[in-house]
Regions:
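Flexible "stalk/tail and boundary" regions
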Residues: 1-10, 16-17, 26-84, 88-89, ...
Length: 146
């Protein structure tokens, strides 16, 4: 799993049943990993996190081991997690509860984030990214050479 990297944006459309079609480049990587199930949960910035099952198990174990003062965040991540299968047409169903929490209606943006994905409402993603680009760069990035 450590060598698999999902990257790049994909503008997608939710169908009438709340499904997205997994882009071919990601579908091929998932198939090579033997992954046919994903886990979807809430992201603290108003989007959704989508994990291949092996990456989810690692994330889930890390979250579950957090101390009691993080119990609220455990509920956000673990209590909202839903397993979904990638269907024969390479579609992924996003549960209505999770679609509502992230404001997903039609136009969405799937971002490859290394070991997992983020799924954003397209307008919310554009606004969030614009705000990030206007904010000061955090100290942790100031040492990067661009």
């Amino acid at each position: 799993m450590a060598n698999v990297v999902f990257q790049g944006p994909a503008a997608l459309t939710l169908d009438g049943k709340g499904r997205i079609a997994m882009p071919a480049r990601h579908r091929e990587l998932l198939a090579a990993m033997g992954v046919h199930q994903l886990t979807v949960t809430k992201h603290p910035e108003g989007s959704l996190l989508i994990f291949p099952r092996p990456a989810w198990e690692y994330f889930r174990d890390r979250v579950a081991s957090l101390p009691m003062d993080s119990s609220g965040w455990k509920r956000v991540f673990l209590g909202n997690a839903m397993d979904v299968d990638i269907d024969a047409s390479s579609r992924v169903l996003i549960a209505p509860e999770l679609r509502a929490s992230a404001g997903l209606v039609r136009d969405v943006m799937l971002l490859g984030m290394g070991s997992h994905f983020e799924l954003w409402d397209a307008e919310r993603h554009a606004a969030h990214e614009a705000a990030v680009m206007q904010s000061p760069m955090p100290d942790s990035l100031k040492q990067f050479s661009f």
